[in-house]
Amino acid sequence: EEIKRRREEPIDVTGIRPYLEMHPFDIPLPIRKFLTIAVVVAVSPDYVILDEPTAGQDLWGCAQLRKVMDYLQNKGKAVITISHDMEYVAENFERIIVMAHKNVIADGKKEDIFYQKDKLQEAYVKPPLSTQIAQEVGIKKNILNMQELINCYK
């Protein structure tokens, strides 16, 4: 029963069931990433490191990735993500570590990190678009997503 659960649960969590009967070379590349993630979920490590997980993903893939991360976090697993996609980072993580030239140059809450322009530039990343717009129009409040930006004008 435990073996069956450890096999079936990752398949359902990652949303790959429709692709199980396909030849591996016929599976779309973005879905192949989820096959790999399913194996990781089955092994159930304490820490999961995802390197640029949103690269090549469409909206479904990004939403599915969020479900997988929620599942892992609910199981008490630590999820570490390496990403240049700051929209994704702002939406999914509370703590951000910024690295440049093999060194940690900033570490803290996203509300603080995304307003450190010099540190982000040093790491060759930009804050989320909503944060950039808020800064350009002079909104003093920390804005991290478009809904927060829209709410400033209601």
Where are the model-predicted features located?
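Conserved ABC ATPase "signature" C-loop
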Residues: 101-102
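A short, surface-exposed alpha-helical micro-motif characterized by mixed small hydrophobic
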Residues: 89-91
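H-loop/switch region of ABC-family ATPase nucleotide-binding domains
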Residues: 83-84
